[in-house]
């Protein structure tokens, strides 16, 4: 038995909203699709020593289930359908889908199974890993230190924004997956609720309990899976965009742009998509360059950028968000999703740079070729070459 035997997670809804949004779409359209996903630590942390503790938490997750009050709350949201929610009511995590190993100090995790089930593991599992590691490394740290750090940042934020009209500044908590702990995330979000510019959280459990707006649409895996679901690789991104609109024709209309670079995305994002989607989300590459490309694209299509929203969510902190707001606020609607720099920003605490990404769909490779070379993930170099050729991308930077 490990030092921390009690479960880290207490609710099936302690996850990012887009996981349920994507899960419903998969449930309706791709029920029998199978996938594989893998854990990556982008830093130099040797996390293999935590494998036993992580495995123990994975086993505990099989006891999580949707509670009646949670079911009723989800039923009151406008985008969930009864057939999906009734299925979710019976959903249980299956620990047999998760292989956790310590490979000479390196933590390896591989997830396999039906996409409709595997899709749920990523966010809570990353949150578990982050919390376990920080419990071991920084047992003396917690809510008090996190709130002290936040108050200091808010003082700086007030000074930075003293000359700005902040009425169109919108901030969201995107901090579940790399949080210091569940308690820290809740405390941070509760404090931010006092600010007029704080508009919601990606965490469905917190949104329900704190009466906040849940935030999120789709992730890279939605686009990655379509690389094998779609019969034609070159049209797979358009297929993913169309399938999303099929499930959510009038809601959840922020599209993620960097699964196969922003330039390739914009070539696929024609007038119909640009009109029907409410906006775009940035998650890699230079944010100012990306925003300028997005605005120019809307203008080229004859669409007023002020009718659309750009969501920035890549490695943001409050200062970066203010800088972007200062640059773009007169030309387009803006929202900012901050994760690690809110929920794991404590002095002397090193946040983990960890991800879980799709690597296979129906037994075949998928890839993410983002606007940041270090974020490229794929085992199969031949598939990466085929993907780059299909989307007319320049010569590959080294995949990792």
UniProtKB/Swiss-Prot annotation:
Involved pathway(s): Cofactor biosynthesis; NAD(+) biosynthesis; nicotinate D-ribonucleotide from nicotinate: step 1/1
BP GO terms, sorted: NAD biosynthetic process via the salvage pathway
PTM annotation (Phosphohistidine): residues: 220
Keyword Ligase: yes
UniProt superkingdom: Bacteria
Enzyme class: ligase
Record keywords, A-Z: Ligase, Phosphoprotein, Pyridine nucleotide biosynthesis
Sample GO molecular function, one term: nicotinate phosphoribosyltransferase activity
UniProt keyword Phosphoprotein present: yes
Listed Gene3D superfamilies: nicotinate phosphoribosyltransferase (3.20.140.10)
UniProt PTM: Transiently phosphorylated on a His residue during the reaction cycle. Phosphorylation strongly increases the affinity for substrates and increases the rate of nicotinate D-ribonucleotide production. Dephosphorylation regenerates the low-affinity form of the enzyme, leading to product release.
Chemical reaction(s) catalysed: nicotinate + 5-phospho-alpha-D-ribose 1-diphosphate + ATP + H2O = nicotinate beta-D-ribonucleotide + ADP + phosphate + diphosphate
Recorded GO CC terms: cytosol
Protein purpose: Catalyzes the synthesis of beta-nicotinate D-ribonucleotide from nicotinate and 5-phospho-D-ribose 1-phosphate at the expense of ATP.
PANTHER family xrefs: NICOTINATE PHOSPHORIBOSYLTRANSFERASE (PTHR11098:SF1)
Similarity remark: Belongs to the NAPRTase family.
Protein name, per record: Nicotinate phosphoribosyltransferase
Gene that produces this protein: pncB
């Amino acid at each position: 038995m490990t030092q921390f035997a009690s479960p880290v997670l207490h609710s099936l809804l302690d996850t990012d909203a887009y996981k349920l949004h994507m899960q419903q779409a998969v449930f309706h359209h791709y029920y029998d699709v199978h996938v594989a996903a893998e854990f990556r630590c982008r830093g130099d942390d040797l996390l293999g020593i935590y494998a036993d503790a992580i495995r123990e938490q994975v086993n505990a997750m099989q006891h999580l289930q949707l509670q009646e009050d949670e079911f009723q709350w989800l039923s009151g949201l406008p985008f969930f359908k009864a057939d999906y929610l009734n299925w979710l009511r019976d959903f249980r995590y299956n620990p047999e889908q998760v292989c956790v190993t310590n490979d000479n100090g390196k933590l390896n995790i591989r997830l396999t199974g039906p996409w409709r089930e595997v899709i749920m593991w990523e966010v809570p599992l990353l949150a578990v890993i982050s919390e376990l590691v920080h419990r071991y490394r920084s047992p003396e740290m917690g809510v008090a230190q996190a709130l002290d750090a936040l108050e200091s940042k808010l003082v700086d934020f007030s000074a930075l924004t003293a000359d700005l009209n902040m009425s169109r500044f919108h901030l969201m908590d995107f901090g579940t997956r790399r949080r210091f702990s569940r308690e820290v995330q809740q405390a941070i979000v509760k404090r931010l609720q006092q600010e007029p510019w704080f508009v919601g959280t990606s965490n469905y459990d917190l949104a329900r309990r704190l009466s906040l707006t849940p935030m999120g649409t789709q992730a890279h895996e939605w686009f990655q899976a379509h690389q094998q679901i779609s019969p034609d690789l070159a049209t797979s991104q358009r297929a993913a965009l169309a399938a999303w609109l099929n499930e959510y024709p009038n809601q959840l209309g922020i599209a993620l742009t960097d699964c196969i670079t922003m330039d390739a995305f914009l070539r696929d994002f024609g007038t119909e998509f640009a009109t029907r989607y409410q906006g775009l989300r940035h998650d890699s590459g230079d944010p100012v360059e990306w925003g300028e490309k997005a605005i120019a694209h809307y203008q080229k299509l004859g669409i007023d950028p002020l009718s659309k929203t750009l969501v920035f969510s890549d490695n943001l902190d409050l200062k970066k968000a203010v800088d972007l707001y200062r640059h773009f606020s007169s030309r387009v609607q803006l929202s900012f999703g901050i994760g690690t720099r809110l929920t794991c920003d404590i002095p002397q605490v090193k946040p983990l740079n960890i991800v879980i990404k799709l690597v296979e769909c129906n037994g075949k490779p998928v890839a993410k070729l983002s606007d940041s070379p270090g974020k490229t993930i794929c085992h199969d170099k031949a598939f990466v070459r085929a993907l780059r050729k299909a989307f007319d991308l320049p010569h590959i930077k080294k995949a990792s």
